[in-house]
Amino acid sequence: MTQRTLGGTNRKQKRTSGFRARMRTHNGRKVIQARRSKGRHRLAV
């Protein structure tokens, strides 16, 4: 019997919290701007 590992999918992750998904909305752009000013190496997933 196989068990569900609840691993998640990369496509869903990119579509919801990827860079292009962030740039699509005003608040998403604010997220990118905040992470840039903080000096984050990774701006989005």
Swiss-Prot record:
GO molecular function: structural constituent of ribosome
UniProt record similarity statement: Belongs to the bacterial ribosomal protein bL34 family.
Composition-biased stretches (Polar residues): 1-10
Protein name as it appears in the record: Large ribosomal subunit protein bL34
Chain intervals with Basic residues compositional bias: 11-45
GO CC term, one of those recorded: ribosome
GO biological process, one term: translation
Transmembrane listed as a keyword: no
Signal peptide positions on this chain: none
Keywords from the named record: Ribonucleoprotein, Ribosomal protein
Keyword Ribonucleoprotein on entry: yes
